[in-house]
Amino acid sequence: MLDILRFVLICGILWILRRVLLRVFIHSPLDKIPGPPPVSFAKGNLPQLYDRNGWDFIKGLGEKYGGVVKINGLYGAKMLFVFDPAALSSVVVKDQYVYERSEDATKSTRLMLGDGLLTSQGETHRKQRKLMNPVFSINHMRDMMPIFYQISRNLRDAIASRIDNGEKEIDVLDWMARTALELVGQAGLGYSFDPLVQDKADAYAEAIKALVPTAFGLRLYRPLLPIALKIGTPAIRRRILKLIPSTRLQRMREISDAIDAHSKRIFEEKKQALARGDEAVLKQVGAGKDILSRLMQANMTASEEDRLPENELLGQMSTFIFAGMDTTSGALAHTLQLLAEHPDVQDKMRAEIVAALGGGQEIPYDTLVDLPYLDAVCRETLRLYAPVTTVNRTAQEDIVLPLSEPIRGTDGNLIQEIPVPKGTEVIVGILASNRNPALWGPDAAEWKPERWLEPLPDTINTARVPGVYSHLMTFLGGGRACIGFKFSQLEMKVVLAVLLSSFKFSLSSKEIVWNVAGIQYPTVGASGKPEMPMKIDRVKNT
């Protein structure tokens, strides 16, 4: 077994050496694209881009170089950082099937999450979305409102029981993460992960929370994955994996195993309930209205051509949990922090919510989604603090990238379009696009919910940013736009409506730092632990 491990290591070194030599000695069309110097040849600019304070680096790219910038990847790789609107349209809409996820990114995600939307490509991806689009429809969102409200009330009661004696400091991120998991569990999978009663979160929730930071720490090894997956059988590869003395790698294996085991158990229970008939389905969590039940029922009646195999249905489960937990919980936590920083906005938003409740417990779907100030606060938070800051795509063939505005090359000439060689990694600058002052104006870096209560700048409307949501790249666009973005919006609005009608949120004395790398998450000061303490008190009736 050790001989196989040495063989894998030698193959990896030779593969890296070959790629390095090709990059050093072969001329690239990207050589004339301006960009910052690398930190080092081995790491390029990636330490700056993925630093916890990476926004300063991203902001500098736009100010100095424009909407398309050449940055340096691992071992001399030439990459493009893109937030020019025309270039974005090409990458995520017009030429979306040329710009796919890289082989190593796809395979590493598949190992963690299975064969879901995040790992499928081409015809398989189109087939999966075709079957899944109806279960994310507005009509289905209406059906899930009782689930959303019940879980949000459970959260409210849990917080209320902890502040009986007055204002108390509570880790808001932890509670938002637990709530997001329970929402995606019940509404997405028809399964309850966490009743929101105990102070300690569910062990499965803890594993999911650790997934992104753990995987992010292994990103430098990802290019070796395609080679490693060609060696032996899965059983042999697993034995080799257990021999590698890496705490982070072994933690990643444990997390992946936990996700897989939990998903299979839920799936089997759901299959058995569907086989027993309607009465058994109604007795399950969610009463058969959850996304997975609807998806499995649709799959059973689909044509042979459109039907998904079980491994792809299982993959959707892991994808729901992964995509729906960290992103939404982070967005909710950030919104509450911003409301604490702007108490006048919090008061105005609370007044709107209380008026809409009219003394009742729930705001109907149509009324809730149309509350103007609540909607403005959510949109502005998702604009300025998009949970996912960048996504990566790789050109599967040679292609030309159009530009809205020309950039000046390193030779002094204006560049109107960029030839992109096959294999080039393109980084979609989600946060950079959302904060682009050329589109949003000089106050683009300010949190101003009121901007959504008046007409947006003409520069926004004419730019045609290809995002599926409000001229923003937060949920991407095209065939790979976030399929659950309406689910996420509804989740945010219901939770905020329930919490703000009962509680007042204030800032902790502790310094909160938002880490930009990958998925944004808060920490206290220089700590690496995701958390966000806030002071919470009951709303005083007047």
Swiss-Prot record:
Heme binds at residue 482. Pfam families: p450. Pathway: Secondary metabolite biosynthesis. The keyword Metal-binding applies. Its EC number is 1.-.-.-. SUPFAM superfamilies: Cytochrome P450 (SSF48264). The keyword Oxidoreductase applies. Cytochrome P450 monooxygenase that is able to use dehydroabietic acid as a substrate for oxidation. PANTHER family: CYTOCHROME P450 (PTHR24305), CYTOCHROME P450 12A4, MITOCHONDRIAL-RELATED (PTHR24305:SF166). This is Cytochrome P450 monooxygenase 91. The gene is CYP091.
